[in-house]
Swiss-Prot record:
One of its GO terms (molecular function) is ATP binding. Produces ATP from ADP in the presence of a proton gradient across the membrane. The gamma chain is believed to be important in regulating ATPase activity and the flow of protons through the CF(0) complex. GO terms for cellular component: plasma membrane; proton-transporting ATP synthase complex. Signal peptide: none annotated. One of its GO terms (biological process) is proton motive force-driven plasma membrane ATP synthesis. Belongs to the ATPase gamma chain family. F-type ATPases have 2 components, CF(1) - the catalytic core - and CF(0) - the membrane proton channel. CF(1) has five subunits: alpha(3), beta(3), gamma(1), delta(1), epsilon(1). CF(0) has three main subunits: a, b and c. It is a peripheral membrane protein. It is found in: Cell inner membrane. This is ATP synthase gamma chain. The keyword ATP-binding does not apply. It comes from the Bacteria. Keywords: ATP synthesis, Cell inner membrane, Cell membrane, CF(1), Hydrogen ion transport, Ion transport, Membrane, Transport.
Length: 293
């Protein structure tokens, strides 16, 4: 059994670690709130863009953008969004499990897959377990611009436009609340019909007016669809950042609480040993006094 000096050293070491985890918990909580604000600010933009595109799509039944045309699937692409740093609980592991489940469905059909990765943890995962990574970006920070993450996204979209890929998914952790993050695999292109669903189409049939398009409706659809796809990916990145910080906050709180429990257990052992040592010393003194007398 450890002596009193060793137990005191362990308690001191755990207390130092507890201070670190508590500080990390507080930092993660602050970053989560800011990330959540940025995430919520972006949602109205994507929703407004979707409504405008829906109007254009239903106003022009003759033109179909490649992003809206389904074709037989021989190869799929995944834009995988992970964190750059660890200490975030099971956030990335759960995401990789959801991704693997989706990939398995296509592997059973002999469909090949390739990956564009955003985040250092994703790069490490594919280095360890394999997978064709066509492009990657890391160190995007807590407040990335779209230019920072654009390269792998654009490379994947170019492959889709050129017919090298027949379907693209975006994989990320959806922020539900501070305690819950949901691993999500959403089809990006071709855009599912639900993206411009019955609500918008119903509205269009009721309207007797239309826009005046400059230079023409095809050019507008091409431009706006590209920006809409970009907004979806960027929003997914912001959701993942908020999820990362909330998961790290919860993980660090659990670590802080566990450290407290461990300190209490060690303190109890320390007190018992100290009491036993005092009792032993008293017994020795009493025994010595009795022998002298």
């Amino acid at each position: 059994m450890a002596n009193l000096k060793e137990i005191r050293a362990k308690v001191t070491s755990i207390q130092s670690t507890q201070k670190i985890t508590r500080a990390m918990q507080m930092v993660a909580a602050s970053k989560m709130r800011r990330a959540q604000e940025r995430m919520e600010v972006g949602r109205p933009y994507a929703d407004s863009m979707r409504r405008v595109i829906s109007h254009l799509v239903h106003a022009s039944s003759d033109y179909k953008h490649p992003y809206m045309v389904s074709r037989p699937v021989n190869r799929v692409g995944y834009i995988v969004i992970t964190s750059d740093r660890g200490l975030a609980g099971g956030l990335n592991i759960n995401l990789f499990k959801a991704l693997s489940k989706n990939i398995q469905k296509y592997q059973e059909q002999s469909v090949q897959a390739e990956f564009a990765v955003i985040g250092a943890k994703g790069v490490s995962f594919f280095k360890s377990f394999g997978g064709k990574v066509t492009s990657a970006v890391t160190d995007y920070g807590d407040k990335p611009t779209f230019e920072q993450i654009n390269a792998p996204v654009q490379a994947m979209l170019d492959d889709y436009t050129n017919g090298k890929i027949d379907r693209i998914y975006v994989v990320y952790n959806k922020f539900v609340n501070a305690m819950t993050q949901k691993p999500t695999v959403n089809q990006l292109v071709p855009l599912p019909e639900s993206a411009f669903g019955e609500e918008e189409s119903g509205i269009q049939t009721e309207l007797s007016w239309d826009y005046i398009y400059e230079p023409d409706i095809k050019t507008l659809i091409d431009e706006l669809l590209g920006r809409y796809i970009e907004s979806i990916v960027y929003q997914a990145v912001m959701e993942n950042i908020a999820s990362e910080q909330s998961s790290r906050m919860v993980a660090m709180k659990a670590a802080t609480d566990n450290a407290g429990d461990l300190i209490n257990d060690l303190q109890l052992v320390y007190n018992k040993l100290r009491q036993a040592a005092i009792t032993r010393e008293i017994s020795e003194i009493v025994g010595g006094a009795a022998a002298v007398s």
